[in-house]
Regions:
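Membrane-embedded transmembrane-helix bundle of lipid-linked glycan/lipid transferases
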Residues: 1-250
């Protein structure tokens, strides 16, 4: 298990064992082991249920911020958890929530980003609560980027979908300047270790190719089917060649 190996790499003092990659989840599990003696294997085995709970709670908090009735929130969450949609991509996405992997570990942060952005826009200028919300928005954004780049991309689109309804407040001079400063601070906080590692010669981790596949449109249900079909065809050809060789030797 690749993430298991990276965490043990941290224990051995080898940061970014297989290249530069957001390692906030790995550092969290490593810290749990060092501070509390929780075995790395146990964290990997059971943390999925915990971060899934945090994910659902974050969704609840965001929906409570934008919906008047708490029962509507319960209805939305119930539908999300129970409606059976026969779609391979959706089934695959839900199944990933049970695993301890960085993208799913950080999903809760995107909902916190949106929630604190909404709160920031609603509060009066220069109030203590507004400053607190801006700080928490910055920390949520920094956490998303330190955990997984794709979580930050999702947070951007989620925040944008709510910002559309308060576009005038977004571009007010005081608000816009603070938001830009918050985003810059979040990027600096989360990327300094990765930038320094890359600048000192550590290569990027190879899984960035996944992002390129998404951009190219090959990481789809059809694309995965084509890959599986090509592998099956290659296996069939290998089997046919083996039988031909066996018959020739006879």
């Amino acid at each position: 298990y690749v993430h298991h190996a990276w965490i043990y790499g941290l224990q051995e003092g080898k940061i970014f064992l297989e290249g530069v990659y957001p390692e906030a989840m790995h550092c969290f599990i490593y810290a749990m082991n060092v501070l509390f003696g929780i075995p790395v294997y146990s964290s990997l085995l059971f943390l999925g249920e915990i971060h899934t709970s945090a994910f659902l709670i974050a969704i609840y908090c965001l929906l409570r911020e934008v919906m008047k009735s708490q029962y509507t929130v319960y209805l939305v969450l119930t539908a999300f958890l129970t409606v059976d949609v026969m779609c391979v991509d959706e089934i695959y996405g839900i199944s990933r929530l049970q695993y301890t992997i960085p993208q799913e570990f950080g999903l809760y942060t995107e909902f916190l980003c949106a929630m604190y952005l909404i709160r920031f826009m609603r509060k009066k200028q220069d109030s203590k609560e507004k400053k607190d919300d801006m700080f928490l928005f910055t920390m949520a954004l920094a956490s998303s980027l330190a955990i997984h780049f794709y979580v930050t991309i999702m947070a951007f689109f989620l925040c944008g979908s709510f910002a559309v309804f308060g576009i005038r407040k977004i571009f007010q001079k005081k608000n816009f300047g603070k938001l830009i400063a918050a985003v810059i601070a979040a990027v600096v906080i989360s990327t300094i270790p990765m930038v320094l590692a890359f600048a000192t010669g550590t290569p990027l981790q190879g899984s960035l190719n996944w992002g390129m596949n998404i951009i190219n449109g090959t990481d789809t249900k059809e694309g995965r089917t084509q890959v599986a079909q090509s592998i099956n065809d290659e296996s069939s050809m290998d089997e046919a060649a083996r039988k031909l060789l066996e018959s020739s030797s006879e």
